[in-house]
Each structure stands twice: as C-alpha cells, then as structure tokens.
Amino acid sequence: MFYKNRPLSPYVTIYSSQWTSISSIFHRLSGLYLVFFLFVLFCSIKFLFCFSTFWFVYKFVKTCFFFILSFFIVFIVFSMYSLFYHFFIGLRHLVWDEVILMEDNFVTMSTKLSLSLSLVLVLINCLRYFLV
C-alpha cells in the first residue's frame, strides 16, 4: 500500500519538519551556545584581570570601545534568549517526564509558548537594562 504524501524517514530531504523537531535541535544548540558563552565570559574576565595593568591593552580597549561594546551587547542578548529558551524547553521536558500534556496539540502549543515567552522575557530585560 502506497501513501502519496507520507514522509519516508527523518533523514530524507523531503521530510517535513515539525515544531517539536526544530525545537529539539535548537534546544541542543542553545545548550552548546551557553557553554560557549560561559567559556568566553571566563576567558574575558581572566584576560581583563591578567592584562589590566598594561598600558597597551588599556589603549586597545579604549580605541575599540564602541565595537567591543556593540559586540558585547549582541552577545548578551543572544545569551539571554538562549538561556530563557533552554530553561523553558527544560521545563517542558520535566512536564513530559511525568507524562502530562503529551497530546499533539499541547506539544505544539508548548513549543510555541516557550519560543514566545523567551522572546518576551528578552525584550523585558533589554528594556530594563539597556534603555534605563
């Protein structure tokens, strides 16, 4: 029996993606990004403490201040979104461990809800910290 529009496998290029598969991939990527963010944060703190007494480092930071500041702000905003998204998807998985809300419509709704709540929290924090 042949079904015309049925996907064969998730590895086939004609496979139609769902919200849950995309959110699972982005959950893993956000975890990797958070590890990268912590590594860069600790390395930059170490760099500032080790080389803060040298005049050439001070001069370099002073000349590139706006570039460094804009890069840092974008880095912080992406990190906030990644943190909130990873948190909400983790909460969703904790609910799923108790076998609650496992129907298809609730699964899709929880994915969209976690995406939107993450965006709302990032916007609130950006307004709170960057515009005050």
Swiss-Prot record:
<feature type="transmembrane region" description="Helical">
    <location>
        <begin position="107"/>
        <end position="127"/>
    </location>
</feature>
<keyword id="KW-0408">Iron</keyword>
<protein>
    <recommendedName>
        <fullName>Succinate dehydrogenase cytochrome b560 subunit</fullName>
    </recommendedName>
</protein>
<dbReference type="GO" id="GO:0046872">
    <property type="term" value="F:metal ion binding"/>
</dbReference>
<dbReference type="InterPro" id="IPR014314">
    <property type="entry name" value="Succ_DH_cytb556"/>
</dbReference>
<dbReference type="Pfam" id="PF01127">
    <property type="entry name" value="Sdh_cyt"/>
</dbReference>
<comment type="function">
    <text>Membrane-anchoring subunit of succinate dehydrogenase (SDH) that is involved in complex II of the mitochondrial electron transport chain and is responsible for transferring electrons from succinate to ubiquinone (coenzyme Q).</text>
</comment>
<dbReference type="GO" id="GO:0006099">
    <property type="term" value="P:tricarboxylic acid cycle"/>
</dbReference>
<keyword id="KW-0249">Electron transport</keyword>
<keyword id="KW-0813">Transport</keyword>
<comment type="subunit">
    <text>Forms part of complex II containing four subunits: a 70 kDa flavoprotein (FP), a 27 kDa iron-sulfur protein (IP), a cytochrome B and a membrane-anchoring protein.</text>
</comment>
<dbReference type="GO" id="GO:0005743">
    <property type="term" value="C:mitochondrial inner membrane"/>
</dbReference>
<keyword id="KW-0472">Membrane</keyword>
<dbReference type="InterPro" id="IPR034804">
    <property type="entry name" value="SQR/QFR_C/D"/>
</dbReference>
<dbReference type="InterPro" id="IPR018495">
    <property type="entry name" value="Succ_DH_cyt_bsu_CS"/>
</dbReference>
<keyword id="KW-0816">Tricarboxylic acid cycle</keyword>
<keyword id="KW-0349">Heme</keyword>
<keyword id="KW-0812">Transmembrane</keyword>
<comment type="pathway">
    <text>Carbohydrate metabolism; tricarboxylic acid cycle.</text>
</comment>
<comment type="similarity">
    <text>Belongs to the cytochrome b560 family.</text>
</comment>
<keyword id="KW-0999">Mitochondrion inner membrane</keyword>
<feature type="transmembrane region" description="Helical">
    <location>
        <begin position="32"/>
        <end position="49"/>
    </location>
</feature>
<keyword id="KW-0496">Mitochondrion</keyword>
<dbReference type="GO" id="GO:0006121">
    <property type="term" value="P:mitochondrial electron transport, succinate to ubiquinone"/>
</dbReference>
<feature type="transmembrane region" description="Helical">
    <location>
        <begin position="59"/>
        <end position="81"/>
    </location>
</feature>
<feature type="binding site" description="axial binding residue">
    <location>
        <position position="86"/>
    </location>
    <ligand>
        <name>heme</name>
    </ligand>
</feature>
<keyword id="KW-1133">Transmembrane helix</keyword>
<dbReference type="InterPro" id="IPR000701">
    <property type="entry name" value="SuccDH_FuR_B_TM-su"/>
</dbReference>
<dbReference type="GO" id="GO:0009055">
    <property type="term" value="F:electron transfer activity"/>
</dbReference>
<keyword id="KW-0479">Metal-binding</keyword>
